[in-house]
Protein backbone atom coordinates (compact mmCIF):
# COMPACT_ATOMS: atom_id res chain seq x y z
CA UNK A 1 0.00 0.00 0.00
CA UNK A 2 1.17 3.53 -0.72
CA UNK A 3 0.07 4.75 2.72
CA UNK A 4 -0.17 3.14 6.15
CA UNK A 5 -3.12 0.84 6.81
CA UNK A 6 -5.85 2.71 8.67
CA UNK A 7 -7.47 0.64 11.40
CA UNK A 8 -10.39 1.39 13.69
CA UNK A 9 -9.91 -0.43 16.99
CA UNK A 10 -13.29 -1.21 18.52
CA UNK A 11 -13.62 -2.54 22.05
CA UNK A 12 -15.10 -1.77 25.45
CA UNK A 13 -11.84 -3.20 26.83
CA UNK A 14 -9.63 -0.14 26.56
CA UNK A 15 -8.14 2.13 29.22
CA UNK A 16 -9.05 5.75 29.83
CA UNK A 17 -7.87 8.54 32.09
CA UNK A 18 -10.63 7.50 34.51
CA UNK A 19 -9.79 3.77 34.34
CA UNK A 20 -6.11 3.60 33.35
CA UNK A 21 -5.64 -0.16 33.84
CA UNK A 22 -8.92 -1.30 32.26
CA UNK A 23 -8.11 -3.36 29.16
CA UNK A 24 -4.50 -2.19 29.16
CA UNK A 25 -3.52 -5.38 27.32
CA UNK A 26 -5.53 -4.24 24.28
CA UNK A 27 -3.83 -0.85 24.32
CA UNK A 28 -0.42 -2.50 24.66
CA UNK A 29 -0.90 -4.64 21.55
CA UNK A 30 -2.04 -1.60 19.60
CA UNK A 31 0.91 0.52 20.74
CA UNK A 32 3.32 -2.21 19.69
CA UNK A 33 1.66 -2.39 16.27
CA UNK A 34 1.88 1.39 15.85
CA UNK A 35 5.62 1.26 16.52
CA UNK A 36 6.05 -0.34 13.10
CA UNK A 37 5.05 2.95 11.48
CA UNK A 38 2.91 1.04 8.99
CA UNK A 39 -0.45 1.60 10.65
CA UNK A 40 -2.58 4.60 11.55
CA UNK A 41 -5.41 4.11 14.00
CA UNK A 42 -8.17 5.62 16.03
CA UNK A 43 -9.95 3.89 18.88
CA UNK A 44 -13.66 3.65 19.57
CA UNK A 45 -14.07 2.37 23.13
CA UNK A 46 -17.73 2.62 24.22
CA UNK A 47 -18.52 3.06 27.91
CA UNK A 48 -21.79 2.25 29.72
CA UNK A 49 -23.83 5.37 30.46
CA UNK A 50 -24.13 6.29 34.13
CA UNK A 51 -25.49 9.56 35.59
CA UNK A 52 -23.16 10.17 38.55
CA UNK A 53 -19.44 10.58 39.14
CA UNK A 54 -19.90 10.30 42.91
CA UNK A 55 -17.13 8.02 44.21
CA UNK A 56 -19.59 5.92 46.21
CA UNK A 57 -20.67 4.30 42.93
CA UNK A 58 -17.21 2.80 42.43
CA UNK A 59 -16.51 1.61 38.89
CA UNK A 60 -19.76 3.10 37.62
CA UNK A 61 -18.61 6.53 38.77
CA UNK A 62 -15.34 6.05 36.90
CA UNK A 63 -17.28 5.19 33.76
CA UNK A 64 -19.29 8.38 34.15
CA UNK A 65 -16.05 10.34 34.56
CA UNK A 66 -14.56 8.97 31.34
CA UNK A 67 -14.09 11.80 28.82
CA UNK A 68 -16.01 11.64 25.55
CA UNK A 69 -12.73 11.96 23.65
CA UNK A 70 -9.12 11.97 24.74
CA UNK A 71 -5.60 11.35 23.54
CA UNK A 72 -3.73 8.49 25.22
CA UNK A 73 -0.11 7.80 24.30
CA UNK A 74 -0.62 9.77 21.10
CA UNK A 75 -3.74 7.80 20.10
CA UNK A 76 -7.10 9.47 19.49
CA UNK A 77 -9.68 7.62 21.63
CA UNK A 78 -13.45 8.16 21.53
CA UNK A 79 -15.72 6.95 24.34
CA UNK A 80 -19.36 7.08 23.19
CA UNK A 81 -21.97 6.08 25.78
CA UNK A 82 -24.33 3.16 25.42
CA UNK A 83 -27.22 2.21 27.72
CA UNK A 84 -27.10 -0.87 29.92
CA UNK A 85 -30.54 -2.42 30.30
CA UNK A 86 -31.18 -4.37 33.54
CA UNK A 87 -32.00 -8.09 33.22
CA UNK A 88 -31.93 -8.15 29.41
CA UNK A 89 -28.67 -6.21 29.02
CA UNK A 90 -26.58 -9.23 28.03
CA UNK A 91 -28.96 -10.05 25.19
CA UNK A 92 -29.32 -6.60 23.65
CA UNK A 93 -25.83 -5.26 24.41
CA UNK A 94 -24.42 -5.89 20.90
CA UNK A 95 -27.17 -3.86 19.23
CA UNK A 96 -26.90 -1.07 21.80
CA UNK A 97 -23.14 -0.94 21.28
CA UNK A 98 -23.52 -0.79 17.51
CA UNK A 99 -26.19 1.92 17.74
CA UNK A 100 -23.97 4.03 20.01
CA UNK A 101 -20.99 3.62 17.69
CA UNK A 102 -22.42 4.37 14.27
CA UNK A 103 -22.65 8.14 14.78
CA UNK A 104 -19.06 8.57 16.02
CA UNK A 105 -17.81 6.33 13.21
CA UNK A 106 -19.54 8.47 10.62
CA UNK A 107 -18.01 11.59 12.22
CA UNK A 108 -14.53 10.07 12.03
CA UNK A 109 -15.07 9.44 8.35
CA UNK A 110 -16.33 13.01 7.88
CA UNK A 111 -13.16 14.25 9.64
CA UNK A 112 -11.12 12.47 6.99
CA UNK A 113 -10.32 9.21 8.75
CA UNK A 114 -11.84 6.68 6.38
CA UNK A 115 -10.46 3.54 8.00
CA UNK A 116 -9.62 0.42 5.99
CA UNK A 117 -10.76 -2.19 8.49
CA UNK A 118 -12.24 -2.75 11.93
CA UNK A 119 -9.96 -4.34 14.53
CA UNK A 120 -12.36 -5.57 17.25
CA UNK A 121 -11.39 -7.12 20.57
CA UNK A 122 -13.52 -9.50 22.65
CA UNK A 123 -16.21 -11.46 20.84
CA UNK A 124 -19.20 -10.58 23.00
CA UNK A 125 -20.73 -8.09 22.91
CA UNK A 126 -17.96 -6.14 21.17
CA UNK A 127 -17.25 -8.52 18.30
CA UNK A 128 -20.92 -9.03 17.53
CA UNK A 129 -21.48 -5.26 17.47
CA UNK A 130 -18.42 -4.85 15.26
CA UNK A 131 -19.81 -7.43 12.83
CA UNK A 132 -22.99 -5.36 12.54
CA UNK A 133 -20.95 -2.19 11.95
CA UNK A 134 -18.66 -3.86 9.42
CA UNK A 135 -21.66 -5.01 7.44
CA UNK A 136 -23.26 -1.54 7.51
CA UNK A 137 -20.04 0.24 6.55
CA UNK A 138 -18.77 -2.44 4.14
CA UNK A 139 -15.43 -2.80 5.90
CA UNK A 140 -13.35 -5.92 6.51
CA UNK A 141 -13.36 -7.14 10.10
CA UNK A 142 -10.89 -8.91 12.39
CA UNK A 143 -12.06 -10.00 15.85
CA UNK A 144 -9.65 -11.05 18.60
CA UNK A 145 -10.81 -13.56 21.21
CA UNK A 146 -9.26 -12.99 24.61
CA UNK A 147 -10.66 -15.51 27.07
CA UNK A 148 -14.06 -15.49 28.73
CA UNK A 149 -15.67 -14.37 25.48
CA UNK A 150 -15.12 -17.93 24.24
CA UNK A 151 -14.57 -20.01 27.38
CA UNK A 152 -17.47 -18.71 29.49
CA UNK A 153 -20.06 -16.55 27.70
CA UNK A 154 -20.94 -19.21 25.08
CA UNK A 155 -22.49 -21.26 27.88
CA UNK A 156 -25.51 -19.00 27.32
CA UNK A 157 -27.44 -20.09 24.23
CA UNK A 158 -28.33 -16.74 22.63
CA UNK A 159 -24.90 -15.11 23.07
CA UNK A 160 -23.36 -18.31 21.72
CA UNK A 161 -25.44 -18.07 18.55
CA UNK A 162 -24.51 -14.41 18.12
CA UNK A 163 -20.81 -15.13 18.67
CA UNK A 164 -20.93 -17.87 16.04
CA UNK A 165 -22.67 -15.50 13.65
CA UNK A 166 -19.98 -12.85 14.20
CA UNK A 167 -17.18 -15.40 13.73
CA UNK A 168 -18.70 -16.47 10.42
CA UNK A 169 -19.10 -12.84 9.32
CA UNK A 170 -15.55 -11.86 10.30
CA UNK A 171 -12.84 -11.87 7.67
CA UNK A 172 -10.43 -13.05 10.37
CA UNK A 173 -10.80 -14.42 13.89
CA UNK A 174 -7.72 -14.16 16.08
CA UNK A 175 -7.08 -16.05 19.31
CA UNK A 176 -4.44 -14.99 21.82
CA UNK A 177 -3.79 -18.71 22.36
CA UNK A 178 -4.33 -21.94 20.46
CA UNK A 179 -6.94 -23.12 22.97
CA UNK A 180 -9.29 -20.27 22.01
CA UNK A 181 -8.82 -20.86 18.29
CA UNK A 182 -9.69 -24.51 18.89
CA UNK A 183 -13.11 -23.40 20.18
CA UNK A 184 -13.77 -21.61 16.89
CA UNK A 185 -12.48 -24.57 14.92
CA UNK A 186 -14.92 -26.77 16.83
CA UNK A 187 -17.72 -24.52 15.57
CA UNK A 188 -16.59 -25.22 11.99
CA UNK A 189 -15.46 -21.66 11.32
CA UNK A 190 -13.50 -21.51 8.05
CA UNK A 191 -9.96 -22.62 9.08
CA UNK A 192 -8.41 -20.11 6.66
CA UNK A 193 -9.97 -17.33 8.76
CA UNK A 194 -8.45 -18.54 12.05
CA UNK A 195 -5.18 -17.17 13.41
CA UNK A 196 -3.20 -17.49 16.64
CA UNK A 197 -1.48 -14.25 17.66
CA UNK A 198 -0.30 -14.48 21.22
CA UNK A 199 0.17 -11.49 23.44
CA UNK A 200 3.76 -10.47 23.90
CA UNK A 201 5.50 -8.72 26.75
CA UNK A 202 7.26 -5.36 26.79
CA UNK A 203 10.80 -6.52 27.55
CA UNK A 204 11.95 -2.97 28.25
CA UNK A 205 9.20 -2.18 30.74
CA UNK A 206 9.40 -5.58 32.41
CA UNK A 207 13.00 -6.39 33.20
CA UNK A 208 14.78 -7.78 36.26
CA UNK A 209 15.58 -5.35 39.05
CA UNK A 210 17.71 -6.16 42.06
CA UNK A 211 15.48 -8.08 44.45
CA UNK A 212 17.03 -6.32 47.41
CA UNK A 213 16.51 -2.91 45.82
CA UNK A 214 12.92 -3.72 44.88
CA UNK A 215 12.15 -4.88 48.41
CA UNK A 216 13.68 -1.77 49.91
CA UNK A 217 11.50 0.40 47.68
CA UNK A 218 8.41 -1.52 48.80
CA UNK A 219 9.41 -1.59 52.47
CA UNK A 220 9.80 -5.38 52.57
CA UNK A 221 12.28 -7.62 54.37
CA UNK A 222 13.95 -10.77 53.09
CA UNK A 223 11.15 -13.21 53.98
CA UNK A 224 9.77 -15.52 51.25
CA UNK A 225 7.32 -13.47 49.21
CA UNK A 226 4.40 -14.66 47.09
CA UNK A 227 2.72 -12.26 44.67
CA UNK A 228 -0.81 -12.54 43.25
CA UNK A 229 -1.82 -9.99 40.60
CA UNK A 230 -5.27 -9.45 39.10
CA UNK A 231 -8.74 -8.07 39.65
CA UNK A 232 -10.15 -9.02 43.02
CA UNK A 233 -12.80 -11.37 41.67
CA UNK A 234 -13.43 -15.03 42.46
CA UNK A 235 -12.17 -16.50 39.21
CA UNK A 236 -8.69 -15.01 39.72
CA UNK A 237 -8.21 -17.37 42.67
CA UNK A 238 -6.65 -15.00 45.21
CA UNK A 239 -8.48 -16.94 47.95
CA UNK A 240 -6.64 -20.09 46.92
CA UNK A 241 -3.30 -18.32 47.22
CA UNK A 242 -4.30 -17.30 50.75
CA UNK A 243 -5.08 -20.97 51.45
CA UNK A 244 -1.68 -21.92 50.08
CA UNK A 245 0.04 -19.32 52.26
CA UNK A 246 -1.49 -20.87 55.38
CA UNK A 247 -0.12 -24.28 54.40
CA UNK A 248 3.31 -22.89 53.50
CA UNK A 249 3.73 -21.18 56.85
CA UNK A 250 4.47 -24.55 58.47
CA UNK A 251 7.74 -24.76 56.52
CA UNK A 252 8.27 -21.06 55.81
CA UNK A 253 6.96 -19.32 58.94
CA UNK A 254 7.95 -15.85 57.72
CA UNK A 255 6.32 -16.18 54.30
CA UNK A 256 4.18 -13.30 53.09
CA UNK A 257 1.67 -12.63 50.31
CA UNK A 258 1.18 -9.40 48.40
CA UNK A 259 -2.07 -9.08 46.44
CA UNK A 260 -2.07 -6.44 43.69
CA UNK A 261 -5.43 -5.44 42.25
CA UNK A 262 -8.78 -3.87 43.08
CA UNK A 263 -12.29 -5.23 42.94
CA UNK A 264 -15.45 -6.40 44.58
CA UNK A 265 -13.86 -9.26 46.57
CA UNK A 266 -11.52 -7.05 48.64
CA UNK A 267 -13.37 -7.34 51.94
CA UNK A 268 -14.23 -11.00 51.45
CA UNK A 269 -10.59 -11.83 50.79
CA UNK A 270 -9.54 -9.94 53.91
CA UNK A 271 -12.04 -11.94 55.95
CA UNK A 272 -10.78 -15.14 54.36
CA UNK A 273 -7.22 -14.28 55.41
CA UNK A 274 -8.48 -13.76 58.97
CA UNK A 275 -10.20 -17.15 58.99
CA UNK A 276 -7.00 -18.76 57.78
CA UNK A 277 -5.08 -16.89 60.52
CA UNK A 278 -2.68 -15.28 58.05
CA UNK A 279 -4.14 -11.77 57.96
CA UNK A 280 -0.91 -10.28 59.31
CA UNK A 281 0.98 -11.90 56.43
CA UNK A 282 -1.29 -10.69 53.62
CA UNK A 283 -0.99 -7.19 52.18
CA UNK A 284 -3.55 -5.71 49.79
CA UNK A 285 -1.63 -3.24 47.63
CA UNK A 286 -4.59 -2.06 45.54
CA UNK A 287 -4.39 -1.37 41.82
CA UNK A 288 -0.87 -0.64 40.58
CA UNK A 289 -0.16 1.04 37.24
CA UNK A 290 1.23 -1.35 34.65
CA UNK A 291 4.42 0.67 34.26
CA UNK A 292 5.14 0.27 38.00
CA UNK A 293 4.64 -3.47 38.28
CA UNK A 294 8.23 -4.48 37.47
CA UNK A 295 9.29 -3.52 40.98
CA UNK A 296 6.63 -5.81 42.48
CA UNK A 297 7.48 -8.74 40.24
CA UNK A 298 11.19 -8.32 40.95
CA UNK A 299 10.61 -8.26 44.70
CA UNK A 300 8.69 -11.54 44.71
CA UNK A 301 10.06 -15.06 44.96
CA UNK A 302 7.09 -16.54 43.09
CA UNK A 303 4.11 -15.14 41.19
CA UNK A 304 0.98 -17.24 41.74
CA UNK A 305 -2.05 -17.23 39.43
CA UNK A 306 -4.93 -19.38 40.67
CA UNK A 307 -7.43 -18.53 37.92
CA UNK A 308 -10.31 -20.73 36.86
CA UNK A 309 -10.35 -19.17 33.37
CA UNK A 310 -7.75 -17.31 31.34
CA UNK A 311 -7.09 -16.83 27.67
CA UNK A 312 -3.48 -15.71 27.75
CA UNK A 313 -2.45 -14.46 31.18
CA UNK A 314 -0.20 -11.44 30.65
CA UNK A 315 0.91 -11.39 34.29
CA UNK A 316 2.78 -14.66 33.77
CA UNK A 317 4.95 -13.22 31.00
CA UNK A 318 5.43 -9.95 32.87
CA UNK A 319 6.67 -11.82 35.93
CA UNK A 320 9.00 -14.07 33.96
CA UNK A 321 10.38 -11.07 32.06
CA UNK A 322 11.39 -9.74 35.48
CA UNK A 323 13.11 -13.06 36.24
CA UNK A 324 10.49 -14.29 38.70
CA UNK A 325 9.19 -17.87 38.31
CA UNK A 326 5.48 -18.61 38.31
CA UNK A 327 2.87 -21.07 39.57
CA UNK A 328 -0.39 -21.19 37.62
CA UNK A 329 -3.44 -23.34 37.11
CA UNK A 330 -3.26 -25.54 34.03
CA UNK A 331 -6.07 -23.92 32.05
CA UNK A 332 -6.70 -22.74 28.48
CA UNK A 333 -3.68 -20.89 27.10
CA UNK A 334 -1.55 -21.09 30.25
CA UNK A 335 0.30 -24.29 29.22
CA UNK A 336 1.36 -22.37 26.10
CA UNK A 337 3.06 -19.80 28.34
CA UNK A 338 4.70 -21.72 31.20
CA UNK A 339 7.57 -24.17 30.61
CA UNK A 340 8.72 -26.61 33.34
CA UNK A 341 12.09 -24.92 33.88
CA UNK A 342 10.53 -21.51 34.67
CA UNK A 343 7.49 -22.44 36.72
CA UNK A 344 4.91 -25.00 37.72
CA UNK A 345 1.43 -25.79 36.41
CA UNK A 346 -1.12 -27.21 38.84
CA UNK A 347 -3.89 -29.45 37.54
CA UNK A 348 -5.97 -29.32 40.71
CA UNK A 349 -7.21 -25.82 41.45
CA UNK A 350 -6.73 -25.88 45.21
CA UNK A 351 -4.68 -24.35 47.97
CA UNK A 352 -2.94 -27.68 48.56
CA UNK A 353 -1.81 -28.03 44.95
CA UNK A 354 -0.64 -24.42 44.79
CA UNK A 355 1.24 -24.76 48.09
CA UNK A 356 3.05 -27.88 46.84
CA UNK A 357 4.10 -26.13 43.63
CA UNK A 358 5.26 -22.99 45.43
CA UNK A 359 7.21 -25.08 47.93
CA UNK A 360 9.06 -26.76 45.06
CA UNK A 361 10.11 -23.40 43.63
CA UNK A 362 11.11 -21.96 47.00
CA UNK A 363 13.17 -25.06 47.79
CA UNK A 364 14.85 -25.16 44.37
CA UNK A 365 14.35 -21.84 42.57
CA UNK A 366 15.28 -21.57 38.90
CA UNK A 367 17.92 -19.07 37.89
CA UNK A 368 16.42 -15.63 37.40
CA UNK A 369 18.64 -15.25 34.37
CA UNK A 370 17.16 -18.43 32.88
CA UNK A 371 13.62 -17.24 33.57
CA UNK A 372 14.32 -13.91 31.87
CA UNK A 373 15.97 -15.66 28.92
CA UNK A 374 12.84 -17.75 28.43
CA UNK A 375 10.59 -14.67 28.53
CA UNK A 376 12.70 -12.98 25.86
CA UNK A 377 11.19 -15.41 23.38
CA UNK A 378 7.83 -13.68 23.86
CA UNK A 379 8.52 -10.17 22.60
CA UNK A 380 5.97 -8.33 20.48
CA UNK A 381 7.83 -8.30 17.16
CA UNK A 382 6.40 -11.56 15.78
CA UNK A 383 2.82 -10.65 16.75
CA UNK A 384 3.08 -7.19 15.20
CA UNK A 385 4.47 -8.67 11.96
CA UNK A 386 1.62 -11.18 11.87
CA UNK A 387 -0.95 -8.43 12.37
CA UNK A 388 0.55 -6.30 9.61
CA UNK A 389 0.56 -9.22 7.21
CA UNK A 390 -3.02 -10.21 8.02
CA UNK A 391 -4.41 -6.68 7.92
CA UNK A 392 -2.66 -6.05 4.61
CA UNK A 393 -4.22 -9.19 3.15
CA UNK A 394 -7.70 -8.21 4.36
CA UNK A 395 -7.47 -4.71 2.92
CA UNK A 396 -6.09 -5.96 -0.40
CA UNK A 397 -8.85 -8.56 -0.66
CA UNK A 398 -11.50 -5.93 0.02
CA UNK A 399 -10.06 -3.62 -2.63
CA UNK A 400 -10.00 -6.51 -5.05
CA UNK A 401 -13.70 -7.09 -4.47
CA UNK A 402 -14.41 -3.39 -4.97
CA UNK A 403 -12.52 -3.41 -8.28
CA UNK A 404 -14.23 -6.55 -9.53
Predicted feature residues:
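Short hydrophobic beta-strand element within catalytic cores of glycosyltransferases
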Residues: 325-328
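Nucleotide-activated donor-binding/catalytic signature segment of Leloir-type glycosyltransferases, i.e.
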Residues: 270-288
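Conserved acidic donor-binding segment of nucleotide-sugar-dependent glycosyltransferases
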Residues: 340, 344-351, 359-365
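Carbohydrate-associated surface elements
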Residues: 179, 200
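A conserved mid-protein helix/loop that constitutes part of the nucleotide-sugar donor-binding site
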Residues: 24, 128, 224-247, 264-270, ...
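N-terminal subdomain of nucleotide-sugar transferases
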Residues: 1-71, 398-399
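Short alpha-helical donor nucleotide-sugar binding micro-motif in glycosyltransferases
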Residues: 287-288, 295-300
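Aromatic "clamp/platform" in nucleotide-sugar-dependent glycosyltransferases that forms part
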Residues: 308
Amino acid sequence: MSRPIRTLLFSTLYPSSARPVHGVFVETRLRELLRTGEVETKVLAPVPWFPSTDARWGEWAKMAATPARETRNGIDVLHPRYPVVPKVGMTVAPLLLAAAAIGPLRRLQAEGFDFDLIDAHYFYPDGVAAAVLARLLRKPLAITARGTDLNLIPRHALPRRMIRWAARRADASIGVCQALVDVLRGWHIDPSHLHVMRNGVDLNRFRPLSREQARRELGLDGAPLLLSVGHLIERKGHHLVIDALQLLCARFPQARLMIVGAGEERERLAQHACRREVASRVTFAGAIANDQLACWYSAADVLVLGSSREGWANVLLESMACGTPVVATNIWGTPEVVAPHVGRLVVERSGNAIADAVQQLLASPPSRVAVRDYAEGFGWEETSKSQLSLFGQLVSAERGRDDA
